[in-house]
């Protein structure tokens, strides 16, 4: 089902089952396709990953004092990008099968991967606070009714001075919801909520921005047409700082 301009909820259990099946398709030859899709286009996955990191990394200020919370870490794609010596990295994902892969791929002693639902994230951190939060492609799977609560919970884990990096697929025009929509590309039913840029900024205004953050930068991630191969959606990023 494709719903354009309408609000509808998606099923978390179906999304979790989708990613469980994605984990079964993990291929060391094309590891990032598990969460970036494009199973048959390794070159596109590689180039999108390279370009995303090239654009976003300079905004993150990663160094020895960095304490990173990677929300929806998947198999640890962004953990791979962090080559500096840092203080702490916590990667969380609601799919335990993806977390298992992340733990096998990354053995650095101060990098930790956990499986937990987003509504439990604050209590799972054992009092840890973070100065960098990565939210890469997660809001698209969160229903409206839970979104503000999730964002406020993540804000509560931020240090006084912190950066939040949000990279999301968003609707180029009006909201698009895919609900149990069969994808020929993925060979599976898919659920996602592609919000407009204005909707996301509205969610930030009542959460992060209300707690002292400001939007330091926001724009479309890819300018290249071959990296934007969707007509109704595109990748967009927001850099929030406090």
Listing of model-derived features with the role each one plays in the protein:
Residues 1-64, 71, 75-125, 142-149, ...:
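Class I (Rossmann-like) S-adenosyl-L-methionine-dependent methyltransferase catalytic domain
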Residues 137-141:
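Short catalytic micro-motifs in class I SAM-dependent methyltransferases
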Residues 134:
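A conserved beta-strand element that flanks and buttresses the S-adenosyl-L-methionine
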